[in-house]
C-alpha cells in the first residue's frame, strides 16, 4: 500500500505536506478528502473518489485560492486522515475560572486531538466543529431505530450531515452532552435543559442544550450562540441587516423616542435580538445610560451595561428588570418578555419615562396585543406604553454566484398578484453548497400606534378592524414585504411561502 504523498502527487511540485489548518480534520473526515500543500502554496485535494466539482468550488471559496484534485486509494486517504488525527484537539475538562455563571468552558480547536479521547468524544467534537464551520445555528441529534441522525440548521433550513449506525453510540453522544451541560445523565424519562461553553480559536461560544425523550431514546438540540460572529461580519447596524429604507427610517425614529416601548416579535431564530442590538448600537452616543438584561448576552456592546440572566441564582428577567430601574437608566432592553410579571414591569417602566426595548414570541405584530391580553395585563396601560411593534422574518438570499434570470409560471404570478419583476433563482454551486441560497436578510412589518389605533385596541375592536385601520395608515404586511423582495430578485417564491403566511 502506498501511503506517501509523493506516491500520489508530482514530485517536481513538492515537497508536499498535509494541511489541517486551512482544511480542518473535521471537514477532511466528513468528505474523506485531505488537503496537500506543495511548493509555491500549490494546493491539491486528495480524495478517494472522482472529482466533485461542488466540493472543489466550496474549498476554493473557503481558501480563496485555486485547488487541484487527485484521486487516491481508500487505504491512502484513511492513512492520511489518521496522520491528521493529532491536529484536532477538543473538549478538555477544565473549568473556566473567569466564567460568571459557574459552568465549564472547554477548549475546541484544530491544533491537536487528545489521543486518549474516546471515539464518541471525537465524533461529538467533529460535529460541533463542522457546525461552527458551516455557520449553523442549531445541531439536532435525533435518535432512530438504527442509531441517530445528525442535522444542522443553516440559514434557517435543516440538512442531514451524519448518520450514526449504532444505538449505543447515539446514547453515549447524548450522555456526553449531559456531562458537558452538568445535567443528570441517569434521567432519561424527562426533558432537561442546560448550557455549556467552548473556547474556539480564542473566542468563547455559548451553547444551549435541550434534551427530550423520544421513542428510540433521547433527542438533543444544541443552539449555537456565537457572540463574535456579528463582530467578524462587520459593524452592527440596521443597514447591515437588510431592512428597506422606509423600515430603517421608521425603526430609527421609534428608537429615538424619549419613552415608551418598542417590541420586536417573530419565531425563534428570526433575528429579533440582533435587530435590537443593531438599534441600541446606533442610538448609543454616551449621553444616555443603557442597561440590558439578557439570556444569554449574545453580543457585547461597548458602553452598555449588560446583565446575564442566571435563574439558578434567582436572577430572572423580572427580578433583574426591577433592579435595573433602580440604577437610573434612560433606555432598557429586556431580552424577552416571557411572563406577566416581566410584562407588567416593562409596561410600568415605559409609562414612567423610560424607553424599553424587548422581544415577544408572536406570529405577527397584531398577535402581540393578544399575548399581553392573555397575560392579564390592563390593555389601556399596554397601548399607552406601546409605541410600535416590529414583526420580522429572515429569508434566504439568492446566491449571487449562481443566480440566473427565472420566469415563474403564470399560475404563480396570478396567485401572488404579480405582473412582472426581476426574478432570479440560484442553480446551486460550491459557494451555496448546492442550495441556490447564500446568506439571509430581514423582512418586517411595523405596526406604529397612534391615538386612533390605541382607541380601537383599548376598546377591544375586532382584529380585522384594527388591521384595516393599520393598513389605511400605510402599514405593509410581512407577506407584502417578502413579495417585494422576490420581485427585486433578492429571494424566491419558495422562500416567500416558507417564511410568511398567506392571510
PLM feature segments, named:
Residues 4, 15, 19-22, 76, ...:
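Exposed alpha-helical structural elements
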Residues 69-71:
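Beta-strand-loop-alpha "switch" segments that mediate conformational coupling across diverse proteins
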Residues 13-19, 52, 56, 98-103, ...:
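Poly-acidic low-complexity segments
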Residues 1-65, 74, 83-86, 107, ...:
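Polyanionic, low-complexity intrinsically disordered segments
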Residues 113-130, 134-503:
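Short, flexible helix-loop junctions that flank or precede catalytic/ligand sites
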Residues 12, 16, 74-126:
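Charged, low-hydrophobicity low-complexity segments
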Residues 34-43, 102-104, 109, 325-330, ...:
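Long, low-complexity, intrinsically disordered polar/charged segments
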Amino acid at each position: 500500500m502506498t501511503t506517501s504523498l509523493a506516491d500520489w502527487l508530482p514530485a517536481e511540485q513538492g515537497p508536499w505536506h498535509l494541511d489541517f489548518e486551512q482544511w480542518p480534520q473535521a471537514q477532511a473526515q466528513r468528505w474523506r478528502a485531505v488537503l496537500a500543500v506543495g511548493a509555491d502554496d500549490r494546493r491539491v485535494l486528495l480524495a478517494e473518489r472522482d472529482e466533485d466539482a461542488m466540493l472543489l468550488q466550496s474549498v476554493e471559496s473557503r481558501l480563496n485560492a485555486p485547488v487541484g484534485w487527485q484521486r487516491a486509494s481508500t487505504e491512502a486517504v484513511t492513512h492520511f486522515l489518521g496522520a491528521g488525527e493529532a491536529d484536532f484537539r477538543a473538549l478538555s475538562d477544565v473549568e473556566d475560572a473567569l466564567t460568571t455563571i459557574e459552568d465549564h468552558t472547554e477548549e475546541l480547536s484544530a491544533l491537536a486531538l487528545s489521543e486518549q479521547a474516546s471515539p464518541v468524544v471525537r465524533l461529538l467534537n467533529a460535529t460541533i466543529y463542522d457546525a461552527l464551520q458551516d455557520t449553523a445555528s442549531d445541531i439536532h441529534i435525533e435518535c432512530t431505530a438504527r442509531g441517530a441522525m445528525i442535522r444542522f440548521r443553516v440559514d434557517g433550513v435543516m440538512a442531514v450531515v451524519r448518520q450514526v449506525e449504532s444505538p449505543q453510540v447515539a446514547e453515549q453522544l447524548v450522555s456526553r452532552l449531559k456531562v458537558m451541560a452538568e445535567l443528570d445523565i441517569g434521567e432519561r424519562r424527562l426533558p432537561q435543559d442546560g448550557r455549556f461553553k467552548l473556547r474556539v480559536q480564542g473566542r468563547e461560544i455559548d451553547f444551549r442544550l435541550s434534551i427530550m425523550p423520544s421513542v428510540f431514546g433521547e433527542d438533543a438540540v444544541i443552539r449555537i450562540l456565537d457572540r463574535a460572529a456579528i463582530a467578524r461580519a462587520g459593524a452592527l447596524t440596521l443597514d447591515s441587516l437588510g431592512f428597506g429604507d422606509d423600515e430603517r427610517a421608521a425603526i430609527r425614529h421609534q428608537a429615538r423616542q424619549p419613552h415608551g416601548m418598542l417590541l420586536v416579535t417573530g419565531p425563534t431564530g428570526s433575528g429579533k435580538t440582533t435587530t435590537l442590538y443593531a438599534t441600541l448600537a446606533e442610538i448609543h452616543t454616551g449621553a444616555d445610560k443603557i442597561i440590558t438584561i439578557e439570556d444569554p448576552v449574545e453580543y457585547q456592546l461597548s458602553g452598555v451595561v449588560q446583565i446575564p440572566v442566571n435563574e439558578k441564582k434567582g436572577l430572572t428577567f423580572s427580578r433583574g428588570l426591577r433592579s435595573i430601574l433602580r440604577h437610573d437608566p434612560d433606555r432598557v432592553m429586556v431580552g424577552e418578555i416571557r411572563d406577566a410579571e416581566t410584562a407588567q414591569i416593562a409596561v410600568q417602566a415605559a409609562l414612567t419615562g423610560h424607553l424599553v426595548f424587548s422581544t415577544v414570541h408572536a406570529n405577527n405584530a397584531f398577535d402581540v396585543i393578544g399575548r399581553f391580553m392573555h397575560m392579564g395585563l390592563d390593555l389601556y396601560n399596554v397601548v399607552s406604553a406601546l409605541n410600535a411593534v416590529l414583526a420580522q422574518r429572515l429569508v434566504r438570499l439568492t446566491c449571487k454566484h449562481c443566480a440566473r434570470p427565472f420566469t415563474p409560471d403564470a399560475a404563480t404570478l396570478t396567485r401572488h398578484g404579480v405582473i412582472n419583476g426581476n426574478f432570479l433563482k440560484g442553480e446551486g454551486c460550491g459557494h451555496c453548497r448546492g442550495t441556490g441560497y447564500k446568506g439571509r436578510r430581514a423582512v418586517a412589518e411595523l405596526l406604529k400606534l397612534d391615538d386612533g389605533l390605541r382607541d380601537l385596541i383599548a376598546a377591544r375592536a375586532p382584529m380585522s378592524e384594527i388591521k384595516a385601520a393599520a393598513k389605511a395608515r400605510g402599514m405593509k404586511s410581512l407577506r407584502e414585504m417578502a413579495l417585494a423582495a422576490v420581485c427585486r430578485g433578492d429571494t424566491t417564491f419558495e422562500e416567500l411561502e416558507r417564511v410568511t403566511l398567506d392571510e
